[in-house]
Amino acid sequence: MKFFFILFYPLSLLYQFLFWVSQFKIKPFVLPHVLVISVGNVTMGGTGKTPFVQYLVRYFKAKNKKYAITILSRGYKAKLSKVGAILRDGLSPHLYGDEPSEHKELFPDVQVIIGKNRKESFLKHNQIHSKFHIVILDDGFQHKQIHRDFDIVLLDANGPFGNGQTIPLGFLREPISHLRRAHTIVFTKLTDQNKDKSIRAINILKQKQIPVPSYTSHFLANLVQIDLNTLKSNPVQLPVDQIRQTKVLDEDANDGYFLFTGVGNPKHVLETAESIIGKKINQHRFFPDHYEFEESVLGSIIGEVKQGTVLLTTEKDWVKVRTKKGFLEELKKRNIQIFVIKIEVVVNEKESFESMLAGLVSTYEAKNDLVSMN
């Protein structure tokens, strides 16, 4: 262990220096007449940015109906990321990226724009010309090119800082001290088992004199049964208690469950699925984050599935998998049912957190002389 520390520590310092150089000369561009809220993290791997962005969209759609909403994303691994694009629908994840496609599918009336150069992509593709406009910058904490009015940083309660070291010695994308740039921190995936880790992380922030307010959140998980005959974008959803009563997920009525996923934190997906079903899932295949499922790979998954087994995957994976006609036809042919794990964020300190969000809107309106227009 000591050998690896000695080997990688200089590389970790070099990474920090190169990161500092890359950020030093950037002067953030102020997007005209919009309220910009960034959702980001400081670690590699999944912290729950996608469901948290969706939580914010739901909140603002419910509480600030006069506001138009834009989700601005890089579109990681998307074919059109380099040139930038605006999404018309969520049916082409290979062009626009899996998370942006998932956002557009879930919120058809929300403007979703992708681009490696997010500033230029927004200026080119934005079709909203109202001052009542909220832009949510997805994975934006390290993206200093765009000025943001508020920075929300997510920390996974299972391991907020990893080993406390930056890449490649650890999982941090930048040092813990950089959290001073954040306006608030939200610990995600909180459970009774990892609560102590979040408390220790808060103490570390206090020791480092980082006076950033923090909140906690957990996931509300559900399963959605896919109708393989229609493949509608809004499949029938069953509450957890109803799912447990169906023959489909009755352990006596099938030969088990097979989970496949390509996300940043597959272990947490597995634990979530097991908590919904109420039993252990022994069959699973994990793929790299943003994995593009080919028909051959999906065919090999079907080859491992016994008759009566229920397939499980995530919303992020389903956005891509549903376009594979050969796979879907084989599922129908073999009468294999597939369920999608649906995740929603619940902020534990809901009243305080939503009061903060309401304050952001009020401050923005006062700053831009919009109060009289309400």
Curated annotation (Swiss-Prot):
GO biological process, one term: lipid A biosynthetic process
Keywords tagged on the record: ATP-binding, Kinase, Lipid A biosynthesis, Lipid biosynthesis, Lipid metabolism, Nucleotide-binding, Transferase
Principal EC category: transferase
UniProt-listed Enzyme Commission number(s): 2.7.1.130
Pfam family, one: LpxK
Keyword Cell membrane listed: no
Binding, ATP: 43-50
Pathway as given in its UniProt record: Glycolipid biosynthesis; lipid IV(A) biosynthesis; lipid IV(A) from (3R)-3-hydroxytetradecanoyl-[acyl-carrier-protein] and UDP-N-acetyl-alpha-D-glucosamine: step 6/6
Gene Ontology molecular-function annotations: ATP binding; tetraacyldisaccharide 4'-kinase activity
GO cellular component terms, semicolon-separated: plasma membrane
Catalysis performed (reactions): a lipid A disaccharide + ATP = a lipid IVA + ADP + H(+)
Top-rank lineage group of the source organism: Bacteria
Keyword Oxidoreductase belongs to the record: no
Protein family: Belongs to the LpxK family.
Function recorded in the entry: Transfers the gamma-phosphate of ATP to the 4'-position of a tetraacyldisaccharide 1-phosphate intermediate (termed DS-1-P) to form tetraacyldisaccharide 1,4'-bis-phosphate (lipid IVA).
Protein name: Tetraacyldisaccharide 4'-kinase
